[in-house]
């Protein structure tokens, strides 16, 4: 009961702003050492803090790397489709150290797209497009043109 009354009075004094409650905090809280609060020795707590800082740095580095990879992909797509460049993406790539490449899966997809585009631009790609046309019509036109040329040549040249 005495604790309850003492606690209520100290809270009222704190609210008034006289600052009489600072001594009570020390008595109630025990130590203000965070290591003791977590049940560790000082050395264990320092080692724990170092590990936490290292893990945070690794996570931040991985996050920055992922952001830079995404920015690299956006830059690649902007180049491919001739869109305006973004300063924000270039800044992200520079923050990561300029050694950023596309992720492996995306690189495979980009390579496949480039291969497909090269095939379409090549002669074989054009021939495959011709297969989609009506070959009978093309043959008839070619034969008609050939016979016309042959007839005009026979008329002009008496040797044939």
Curated annotation (Swiss-Prot):
Lipid-anchored residues (S-farnesyl cysteine) = 157
**What membrane topology does the UniProt entry give?**
Lipid-anchor
Q: How is it modified after translation?
A: Farnesylation mediates presynaptic targeting and is important for function in neurotransmitter release.
Q: Which InterPro entries match?
A: Synaphin
- The regions listed as transmembrane in this protein's record are none
UniProt-annotated location(s): Synapse; Cell membrane
Gene Ontology CC annotation, any one? plasma membrane
Q: In which tissues is it expressed?
A: Present specifically in the retina (at protein level). Expressed in the outer nuclear layer of the retina (at protein level). Strongly expressed at rod photoreceptor ribbon synapses (at protein level). Not expressed at conventional amacrine cell synapses, nor at cone photoreceptor ribbon synapses (at protein level). Weakly expressed at cone photoreceptor synaptic terminals (at protein level). Not expressed in the brain (at protein level).
Q: Which UniProt keywords apply?
A: Cell membrane, Exocytosis, Lipoprotein, Membrane, Methylation, Neurotransmitter transport, Prenylation, Sensory transduction, Synapse, Transport, Vision
CDD domains xrefs = Complexin_NTD_CPLX_III_IV
Where is the PTM Cysteine methyl ester found along the chain? 157
Map out region (Disordered) in residue numbers. 14-44
Q: Name one GO molecular function term.
A: syntaxin binding
Superkingdom of origin organism: Eukaryota
Gene null: resulting phenotype: Knockout mice are generally phenotypically normal, viable, and fertile. Normal overall retina structure and morphology of the outer plexiform layer (OPL) and inner plexiform layer (IPL). Abundance and distribution of synaptic proteins remain consistent. Reduced inner retinal processing and retinal synaptic transmission at low light intensities. Cplx3 and Cplx4 double knockout mice are generally phenotypically normal, viable, and fertile, however show disordered morphology of the OPL and vision perturbation when compared to single knockout mice.
GO biological process terms, semicolon-separated: exocytosis; neurotransmitter transport; regulation of neurotransmitter secretion; visual perception
> Which residues are the propeptide, according to the record?
158-160
Assembly and partners? Weakly binds to the SNARE core complex containing SNAP25, VAMP2 and STX1A.
- Family under the similarity heading: Belongs to the complexin/synaphin family.
Q: What does this protein do?
A: Complexin that regulates SNARE protein complex-mediated synaptic vesicle fusion. Required for the maintenance of synaptic ultrastructure in the adult retina. Positively regulates synaptic transmission through synaptic vesicle availability and exocytosis of neurotransmitters at photoreceptor ribbon synapses in the retina. Suppresses tonic photoreceptor activity and baseline 'noise' by suppression of Ca(2+) vesicle tonic release and the facilitation of evoked synchronous and asynchronous Ca(2+) vesicle release.
Know the name of this protein?
A: Complexin-4
Q: What species does this protein belong to?
A: Mus musculus
